Amino acid sequence: MSGKEIHTKATFQVLGMSCAVCALNVETTLGAQEGVYEAKVNFAGSTVLVDYNPQVITPVELQKAVEAAGYELVVENTEDTDHADHLQREEFLALKRKTIGAIVLALPVFVIGMFFMHMPYGNWIMLAFTIPVMAFFGRDFFVHAYMQLKHGRANMDTLVAVSTGVAFLFSLFNTIWPEYWTSRGLEAHVYYEAAAVIIALILLGRLLEAKAKFSTSTAIKKLMGLQPKTVTKILADGSEEEVPIREVEVGDVLVVKPGEKIPVDGEVTEGSSFVDESMITGESIPVEKVKGQPVYAGTINEKGSFRFRADKVGGETVLANIIRMVQEAQGSKAPVQKLVDRIAGIFVPVVMGIAVITFIVWMLIGGDLAFTHALLTSITVLVIACPCALGLATPTAIMVGIGKGAEHNILIKDAESLELMYRVNAIVLDKTGTITEGKPVVTDIHWTPGAEDERYQSILLEIERRSEHPLADAVVQKFKEKVVNEILVSDFENQTGKGVTAKVGDKVYLVGNRALLEVNHVVLDDDNEKLAVRWEGDGKTVVFFAGGGRVLALVAIADKIKESSRQAVATLHEKGIDVYMLTGDNALTARAVADQVGIRHFKAEVMPGEKANFVEALQHEGKVVAMVGDGINDSQALAQADVSIAMGKGSDIAMDVAKVTLITSDLNVIPRAIALSHQTVRAIRQNLFWAFIYNIIGIPLAAGVLYGINGFLLNPMIAAAAMAFSSVSVVTNSLRIKWKKL
């Protein structure tokens, strides 16, 4: 392959796909182009995700390749959701018009063919009604079948075109030259009603299918609806102008008023407000925004007005990345889908072979009505065979499942993780930021007698303000509102691994651990020692504040445990899942946290590389392991796990590696994600079972296997209705996932 290994991923809409074989054809066509690394078609969503090298091939060239294969790839305005919706709506309305027209004309043909077949000029009247059904309303079947034939392929349209085409041509011959049969003492049968009604019913089935498929993409539409269409921009002269969001550029200053949605990512430059960021963080409490703080597209401004500078626009915003992640996940394939694709690839040729064999067998054993039965049964075989149900079985369930996940703060990157999650029997949780809030807070303070003076609080605050230690910030946050005395601190010195020392006036003060006290010969009395040991036993870190040779205060600092942690762990245990906790903290802290949340298995003082080894060891025991983490130090373990889950407030690296991202700090979402996987996999299995059973039973029935037993032959029109019903039932079953409780 020429050119450098530059990867660009883009999702394009595909028009004209009628079945799973069409999706396979588009995928194969794109995959064969030089410069295309991978193409994944989402038949249920009528889209294709293409990973390609823009230096080797352009979207227009991709479009031409797909067009040559008989389909339409929409490359204009790929990020313009209104344009995509418009095209989809136009295609749906065109299909609706064709369906109504076909039904209106097929109805009189059906009535005449079934009840008034011997009326004068009946055959000619039916011919007059059937021609527009075939040539206009059903034209796409024949055009697409011809396009496939040119490439040596066959699809669902081929089955419809051959079956209705044969029925129509045979009927046309018998209408023009009935004497060919009457001269031999036979009746000249016509099957206009079969041809017309089959096309009408298949169009109706596709209309219902398209309507149902729209419902599977509601999650994407909801996410896209979070972004406003227009925005108020500050011009160079200071005036305001409302402009379309697509015209916003990086560096533009925008105005957001109360109740408005924030259009792009940026930084507040003027004013203040509270913003509802629940769609990004999952937290319901509005976040205060002042100058210098970030704001994100799709979040909702609540009370105040403010101006902000656009930093990320278009496809670069956090919201756009979430939408892209959901789209890519909905287009990804579950492992079972690869088997279904292989079956779909040979399905149509096999069915056409069965139809030919059916025709030959009936011609050999059919007696006086051999040709009539041979024609009807072979047409019925072609009509009843349905690769659509097979093709829709997995992707519709995946689309609905991933969409439902997005609505419940669960972003799933690929179908494989969604399919695998229900098999998880071991979950490894990182402590900091996952089980705990990830932010140390002061939980307890004990001032020794005589040290309660507010001056000492001021000294402690001023010393900790100069420290860069994470625990120092917890002390600053605790005292900054209460202390107003200004203190002059000098000779500040950091004692690595121990704490800090500083002077106020001529007195030296210490803030740190026991080692700092020992080095400076400060003795801890029995009462303070007992208190410190008790706090440490609770998993808290104790900071000692001393001055003048004695301990002035003990400050207990802990990483607060999330309110949801205990309930989530209990729910996972109820599901029979073993829960493990890993932490770099000491064993005392680890045990205290594990006891509080009900975790029986934990490992303390774990290095980042050891987390991945721990996960691997569980896998060697035969467990299917999910790893939940939020930091860069979790990325190796996330990559090693069977299912990797990142907390949405974590690092970008953790979220890049993880296949599932929780855009909330609520750990109860984890058991919900597993429940969603159960629901989705169950729907996939049900869909595949019914799709296979339908074809396994339907095709032999259509071939006439019961004729020798009870004289039953399946009517082609009933076969067409059954075929349409099978596709719609699969989509409807997938939609049930939306309404089930997690």
Task: Give residue ranges: language-model regions.
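Bilayer-spanning, highly hydrophobic alpha-helical transmembrane segments
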Residues: 100-109, 338-366, 377-386, 391-396, ...
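Conserved catalytic phosphorylation-site environment of P-type ATPases
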Residues: 280, 339, 376, 386-463, ...
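P-type ATPase nucleotide-binding
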Residues: 442, 446-575, 587, 599-615
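Conserved cytosolic catalytic loops of P-type ATPases
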Residues: 34-56, 60, 192, 221-316, ...
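Membrane-embedded alpha-helical bundles of multi-pass transporters
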Residues: 115-118, 150, 169, 404, ...
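Flexible metal-binding regulatory segments at protein termini and peripheral loops
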Residues: 1-121, 147, 222, 239-242, ...
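Conserved ATP-binding TGD loop and adjacent catalytic N/P-domain core of P-type ATPases
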Residues: 7, 24, 412, 504-506, ...
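Actuator/coupling domain of P-type ATPases
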Residues: 61, 67-78, 82-83, 123-126, ...
